[in-house]
């Protein structure tokens, strides 16, 4: 039991300190450090992420206001805004990148048995996508985006079993999504769901030869011919067609010489027919559509990262500061995911993060906080609401 210990102090107990110290030593993070060590910098930034501070100024102001409690939060000493900004600019971001990748290796296996809704196959399922964070081209000249604007891209390969990232890659805004396939080592028998921006037949054929499966949507200018019709589908499920096609342009059929499967699905909500392409010929046509639909799980992940883990406003503009900020955001997400798995919380990762955020400065037991049955909390809330209205 951790009654008497702040929630935030209990959360940071999940940081793999030995591994972090090894990274600090490797990249000489604490070289000539006085008041602000790399670990203290990490705690300041995690405090900002977990409590929802929107700027470095907010972090320092909040910790200063709780000066009498700061030691009990696990933070050795609070620092001013300029020192924290300077650390973000100068301390090697690879320290935090290394910690993030280490946590990915720990947390992903904890969710390996999680089932994906409406999916019957046991293959590993990945969604690949990116999110763009706008910034000032004047303040962040390194982060070139489209139309002479500044932008930073976070590319994520998300394991759909638990929505845990398998890989994170941060680039400037001009890095094309299809280039990201070159950064991935295909996993045999795994499914990779991606939108049409990733359709690069050289890379997709490399995935195919490696024994991996991919599902995407055809680009508008894709030229092909139907070589066979598959008839083993149920039209009542929304499947309109299941075909085997071959690419017909000289360049594309040279880049991808093998047949491709095309599935057409009628979306009853929008009234539109949607086409999918894949190199898998074994699963049902409806399974193809359902798998691609789960690609939207990564959009929910990005939206949650932006809204709940603080990346709406960047905490610095140099490349090192931006990468540090984004990696600390991912570290916060992974720590919360680890807490949920370790304590077998019935709540989603989002709900666990919310409970921790609103209780960060309370002295309660973390396990009790996130494992209380949902029904008891709802009943307690309803009782309070009824009591309130009974007074009128």
Where are these regions (language model features)?
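Extracellular beta-strand-rich solenoid/capping regions of secreted or surface-exposed proteins
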Residues: 143-145
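Active-site- or DNA-interface-adjacent structural scaffold in DNA-acting proteins
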Residues: 76-141
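Single, function-defining residue in the core of a domain
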Residues: 1-58, 62, 98, 119-124, ...
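Extended, structured, electrostatic nucleic-acid-contact surfaces
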Residues: 67-74
